[in-house]
Amino acid sequence: MIDIIDYNFNNHIKNDNSKFNNILKKYQINNNTFENGAILDLNDIGSNILYKNEDKEKDEEEYYYYKENQNIYNKIGNDLNYNFQYNEYIENNDFENNQPIDNFNVEGSGGGKQIISYYLSKNGNDTTGNGTINSPYLSICKIVNIINSYNGINIFKVFIEIGNYEAVEGCTLNIINNSVVSLIYFTKNEIINNNNNNNFNNNNNNNNNNNNNKNNYNNNKSNLIIPNIINLNINLKNSTFFLNYINLHYFNEKVINITYGINTFQFLIENSNLHCVNPKLPYCNILFNKLNQSLIINDDNEAMILIKNSNIIKFDFYFNIIEMNVENSNLYFTSLYSLISQNLTFSKSYFNNTLIYLVEYQAINVSIDHCKMIYDFSNNIQVFLMGTGNILTISNSQMESTGEFFSSYITCKNAKVQLMNVQFINWYLLRPFINLSLNSTLIMENVFARKMYIPAFIEIGNSELIIDTLEISGNKLVLIIIEGPSVISISYLTLKYQSEQGSPIMMNFPGGGFGMKTIINITSSNFINIDGFTLKDAQLTLFNVSMHSDSINSLFALSSSQLFSSKSTFSSSLIVGSYFLFSLDFTSLVDLDRCILTNSSSLFQANSFSNITITNSLIDSVFSRSVAIEIQGGSSFTMINSIINKTYVVSQSFIYSSSNSDIIIHKCNFLQFVMGLKPLGNFLNSNVFIDHLLLYQSFFQNQIFVATSSIMYISDTKLFNNSIYGSEMFLLNNQSYLLMNNSLIYGNSISVCFSSSHSLANIHNVTFQNNSGIFLYSVDSKISLSLLEFSKNPISSLYYLFYFTNSSATFQQLTIDSNYFMGSVIEAHFSEILFTNLIFSLNQNVDNLLKDRESPSLVFTHSNVKIINSTINSNSQWSLDLIWSQKSILIIKNSLFNSNSIPYNGYLIRLETCHLSLDHCLIFGTQSIEGTIGSFNSIINATNNLFLQNNALEMGGCFFLSNSQILSFSNNSFLNNTASIGAAIFTNGTLINNTLIIKSNKFLNNNAYEYGDNIGSYPTWISVEYPEDFDSTINYIRLYDNYSNLVADNFYTANIIIYDSRVNENISLTTFIRGGSGDFNYSFNVFSIYDFQISINIIADGFNINYLKYKSPPKCLNFQTSTLSDGCIFCPINQAATPEKGECTKCDTNKLVCLNNDVHTLQDYFMINNDVSKVYQCPFGLCSGQNNCNSNLFLLSSLQSPLCSRCLNDYNNENDDENQFKYNNNENSGSSGNSNNNENSNSNSDSNSNSNSNSNSNSNSNSNSNSNSNSNSNSNSNENNYNGGDDDDDEKNINNYKPSKSKNGLYCCNKFQPLLLIPFIFWILFFGLFLSLFKNVITGTMIGQIILFLQLNSIVFYPLPNIYGLQLFRMSIDYFDRYCLFKLDYIEKISISLISIFLIYLIGISDVTSRLILSILKRSLKLKKLIPLVIEKQLRKFEYYKMNRINTRLKSNWNIYLMLIQPLFHCLISLIVPKSIGSTTYLSIDLTILFISTPIQIVFFFSSIVILFLLEFRWWDLIFVFKTILFTSLSVTLLYNPPVYFSALVICQIVYSYSQFAFSPQRKDHMYRVENLLNLFQLSILIVINTSIIRNLSFNLIGILFTIVIFSCSLITIIYKLFFYKKLKTIKNHRLLNLIINVDDNKKKTNKNK
């Protein structure tokens, strides 16, 4: 029932909050009044409240409160009853004249309409009365009969006084023909005005002025205060029926029908009642346009029903009207059947068991405002049944029920419902409360539902639902059941389940078909104790939503659905079960933004390619015994800018993913995790992307992240103050891949940070600080680490920081700084390790006393290790070595070792059976006991390094080499290093070439406390110094190490045994070696007929040194001879002794200078093996005198490089020749030496028990002798340089070397440039194409003669250096001085030249150039103007040459042959001319090639001359061929005698030039003059080069000068011919085009000539 007090007493209560007003709001008029048989008295408001209070609640306090304020209640009743507009009608009526004025404007009522008024009163009389106000009628039927008797259009006004008027049976009021009937209440004794509306007062004696207005209707029911018309039948057709303050009652089993016609009518009820009590039929019916239950719709209908301030009781309305308005009325047990009504409006009314039925497919609008609707029956009746086109609007109303419904309260099919400010209370339904289907729309605003005992609140299918502010409570209630794809919008919903959970939204169909989805939007809502959402093919959007569930089911179970949530909160207190807060399947999606997940267990589960995204959210207080987040089946999980706090996972992982799923975590904080038996993240066959993650203050019993066959990308991550007990932080298994960069690992207590097995890891820019434990453990993996920083880690690991086995690792910019280690820093076994830009500084490594373990910092076994561009600085290694390598390859390049300390027994670098390559490194300030680099049974390559201020208390300040081998050791600098022995290098069982080491490295200010400032070893050999004269008997013993250092570290005893052939017995002596020296007294000064055997043995701790020498009379120095009287003496001036005979031989003063001990060669001469009988002249300027070459590129060795024929570059990067290279550089280019200064123990190596020491000293005998020659004069040398100097030894040594591959002509290459091959190839092609075009006339042209001129000079000046480009004319690839294309010997280069000549010949004899030019011109005739005249002439003759092919072919072949004969002869003759030096014969052109036999090419050459020459050619060609052979032969044979060579060339050139000038073999005059001019130039060049002016010039300047001169002569010749001899005729008409077009004519002419 409507709250009347709320709607009518606003003026009294809107500003009053007193208890009285609260009581008024609490007690409302309800249907109990009518259930007890009473009829409502609108005036008796106060009594009604008292009745309700006394009957139900018996509240004494409220009862007495009512009594005290009874006057106020009465005033309220008056306000209610007079709140009508009845006064408007009374004012406009003339009651005295019985002619009230009609105030109704009825269509058609004007003009001739008759207005008839009648009065009806209980004091009237039907017989005597006339119906006026003074004589009214008594019964209603009297009035009915009168009205029915009228015809036409009339206006009837019936004024009825208070009373009960019952119609007899058959009394029916007929209102037809557009008539108007008004039933109006009136009272005769009351003065009515606008200021007093008290026409209807309650039955209270407190107001005596209104007693006459009451009339008693005594049927023991109630009192009626307005007229009551009982059981009146009404027939309304095309007319108007109006009730004002009139009650219509139908009861006492009376069958009553109020029927209306088809067309226009008005049915107005105002301040009246329609009441049906106990009729015969279940309901009283008012039928509007009901004809056989069919609908008749008239477009002209303008019918209207107005019900205002009235009561409708137990009626059924069937109406087809335009508008129905019910205002401030009460409808009891009434059914409204709207057929085609457009607007139904109910306002401020009360509905009791009232039903509204609307017809489908009609635009019917139902509006209910400020109403109250109560239902108490239990049946299958639907209150609101909405069809297509219907619209229902309920606002500011209350719906309440006490019964139990079997159907929905509101049912919509393709209709629209609006609920605004509505309350639903105490509903019991077996079906959903509201049912929407077939594109219906439901809009709910400010709806409150309490005590709802229904299966579902809303059932929706294929419709739209909008909820704004809904508060609902109930148990096990489904808020929305979705039966088909729909659109749902919910805001400000409060759903709270008390004891049993219910589902907010449930889908009761398989899902959307044909791509249709259910759209759900929920904002600003609260769900408490719910069961969960189960969605399929739906899209759910949440904003500012709070949800809590204690259900064992998932809060969200999604299948092929999407969930978008923002600013929402989700929680579940359940900690057991296998259900997740969010469960996704079949490509579902969850997107959470700014959400909170709290007090939950399992959070997310995704399967079948589903996606979860969390952004800006908080996950707090998670406690789970199972997996919290499970991602499988190709699904993805993304978390961005979120926080996970206080998470406890007992027995499973927090995140588990598998089956090609993706995990993305971006800008998230994981705080205070506690993980049990499983890792935080367990990834199987997944892709993991983590960046900007903060993991803080968490505890793990197992790993943090485990990747198995997965890919992990981690960046910008911070791991702070976490504890991992006994396991790894990151574990990679089974082909996994990890990329981690820009991260910080700080303050963590871990066992292993990264563990990788059969996987790949790339760790970049990671800082590892203040942690404990192993950083990386790798097995069968490939690791790349860059920009890593490890600093300030106290006791990082008790074992190692990095561990690799069977792995590959790359370190780039690794920083290990200020750490304290009790184990190895990096260990690698059977692995490959690369360090680039390593910084290892300020670290300390001590013995691990807890584990009884000594550990080097860097440990490498069976591995390949490279350290490049690195710094190892200021470290303290208290446990063994800083770097320890075993059976590995260690490469260190461009690195710095600075101020490292090894206080105990250890090395900076220790090598055991390793290969070390050290290049461009600085090792500075190493403080150690044993040394800087200790090498044991290893191989050393060290180049371009600096060892500075390294200090070792024992042996080897920089290197300690034990049984090791040096492959290369050059360009190293050892400065200010100190050690007890060998301040730079110490060797034990290792023998290095001291001379080579000293020469190719720099040693400065190194200081050994005992001996070996530069290089030292243990004592290895003994030297005995015998007296130089025959009178002295004191012999000195020197004890040396391998490098001729006096062993001055101890006292040694030497046992001497001398066998003297003079007495034929052994003589024993003993002496002491102090400071490396000792002596014994014995005379060996005898003549050569006697000999001695000296044996010396020194035994000391750890070694045994023996010396055995068969001594003969002393040998003389180089160039000395021996006599019995004078001994060794120098020969007279201009004489010197030869090594072979030992006799004085006269020196050739043109070649040598012989002045006692000063014996040296002059310019352009070279001496072999200090033998004055073996002095040879060098090619032009090749030897500079003093037995030296003119360039430092040559090898100075009289045997290996005779006459400066070999280059140093022949041995660069050639391992086969390394020993030969060392041998060559040990030889001294000086001319004298000392033969008696030292004797060493080389000959006694077999008798020494220490085989290593003896073999080493034997193999380095040359260097030992050489190192002791410092005390002699500059002329001293050692006798072992030539080892006897006989020819057999020379030949043996010479036969061991290979041809030189680093020469450009006679000179050494400075650089190698393969790109020079490209211009050479272009030249060969160009020259071949040129000969192809001019092959028929080339020898008779100026260009041909110039080419021959350049070819000849390229051969003549072959010995000169700095010739550029000229060599191309003899087809040589050495056309750029001091540059070589490749490393090739002379035979290989000649082969290339011969192949090039052959290719030029093949191209030249073809017609390829002519055909190519003609082909181009045929395609573009415009190009013919660009063709030079000389080429055009050859093209014009092309057809003639083709027709005379036999004759021209032979001539052209001969011309090409003449153009190539000079380079061809030079190549062939250079291969057959020998040069003998000593007993060895070399190829004259290259002394590094041994001469074998005459090449077979020369046979083919002479055969070709015979075959190609025919009588028809001129005899002058034979002279040219002869001249070519002569010049070429002289250039090779006289190569080593330049003066004779150039003189012979001058004579030959004079004869040839004169013959050509005198006999004039050239038929063409202009060519005759050109040839004479070229001959003149050639003769002048040959004469000038042999002058003293040229020979006194700089050697390198001569070649450049003559290159310029030769090409200048060629240019002058061309200028002479073109401008000074004869002007070329201008050919105006180009006949080339005619030649191409008229080819057929030319062929005809040729045939005619034949």
Swiss-Prot record:
UniProt keyword list: Coiled coil, Membrane, Transmembrane, Transmembrane helix
Chief localization: membrane
Protein origin, superkingdom: Eukaryota
GO cellular component: membrane
Transmembrane segments: 1314-1334, 1347-1369, 1390-1410, 1454-1474, 1489-1509, 1515-1535, 1539-1559, 1570-1590, 1595-1615
Stretches assigned to coiled coil: 194-225
Bias kind Low complexity: ranges: 1224-1284
Cell compartments where the protein resides: Membrane
InterPro entries found in the cross-reference section: Pectin_lyase_fold/virulence
Protein's membrane topology: Multi-pass membrane protein
Start and end residues of each stretch annotated as Disordered: 197-216, 1218-1296
Name of this chain's protein: Transmembrane domain-containing protein DDB_G0287209
Native species: Dictyostelium discoideum
